[in-house]
C-alpha cells in the first residue's frame, strides 16, 4: 500500500479550465519524488489534492489506501504536510514560535508536547535562536524555513514542497537541500517536491514525474529522465550543466562515465583523466 496514490485524477476550474487530466501517481513510503514541468503544468494544483485542500472533479486520491473524506480530513492533514511556494501564504502568527506551534496545538497536544515539537522543528531547520522573531521581518529563505518547521512540527509521514528553492540565494538552496535529505533519512519521511531547479532534482530525487498541460508525459529514475534531453526541452527545461557537459564529451567519443550530481561528475572526470581507478 502506497502512502499516496491518485487514480485518474482530474480537476477542472471554473471556466472549464482542465488543470489535471487523468493523473495516476504513486508515492511509496520513504522516497524522494520530484515533479517537474513548466509554469502552468498543474503541479501546484496536484499538490493541493494530496492533503485535501482541493477536491477532485473526478478520479481518486488515496492516502494510505483510503479516500479523503470529511471524516478523515484532519488525519490526512496530519499525515501529509504541504508547504506552499510562497511562505507568506501560511505564516500568520506574531512570532516564529507561535507560528510553528499552531499545528501541534490544533492537534490537541499538551503544552509540554507542543514545546518539544516546536524546539525540535526549529532546531532541525536551524532557527532555534529565532523563537521570538516576527516572521514577516525575516528573509525569504528564513520564512521558508519557518513554514517548513510549522509542518514538520506536526510530524507528518509525507512532506510536500511546492518550489522549495524559489527565490532563494545559493546558500538558501544548499540549506534546503540539506533539510530535505535530513527529513527523508532521519525521519523516514516521504518527500515530494516540485522545482525548476533541475540540479536540485539530480541531487535529491529518487524518482521523477514530468508534467505538462495537466498530464504526466513521462516518469522514471534520474538516469532515465535525464538521458532524454529532447523530453526536457519539450517542457521548457534543460539538463544541469555537468551532465550536459559530460553528454557532449561522450558524443565526441571521449570515454567518460555519466554523472548527474556534482559528486558523480567529479568522480567521472577524475577517472577519465586517470586520477583514480
From Swiss-Prot:
The keyword rRNA-binding does not apply. Its EC number is 7.-.-.-. ATP binds at residues 37-44. GO terms for molecular function: ATP binding; ATP hydrolysis activity; ATPase-coupled transmembrane transporter activity. Gene3D superfamilies: P-loop containing nucleotide triphosphate hydrolases. Residues 4-238 form the ABC transporter domain. One of its GO terms (biological process) is cobalt ion transport. One of its GO terms (cellular component) is ATP-binding cassette (ABC) transporter complex. Its main location: membrane. Transmembrane segments: none annotated. PROSITE patterns: ABC_TRANSPORTER_1 (PS00211), ABC_TRANSPORTER_2 (PS50893), CBIO (PS51246). Pfam families: ABC_tran. It is a peripheral membrane protein. Keywords: ATP-binding, Cell membrane, Membrane, Nucleotide-binding, Translocase, Transport. It is found in: Cell membrane. Forms a stable energy-coupling factor (ECF) transporter complex composed of 2 membrane-embedded substrate-binding proteins (S component), 2 ATP-binding proteins (A component) and 2 transmembrane proteins (T component). Belongs to the ABC transporter superfamily. Energy-coupling factor EcfA family. NCBIfam families: cbiO, PRK13652.1. ATP-binding (A) component of a common energy-coupling factor (ECF) ABC-transporter complex. Unlike classic ABC transporters this ECF transporter provides the energy necessary to transport a number of different substrates. This is Energy-coupling factor transporter ATP-binding protein EcfA1. It comes from Methanospirillum hungatei JF-1 (strain ATCC 27890 / DSM 864 / NBRC 100397 / JF-1).
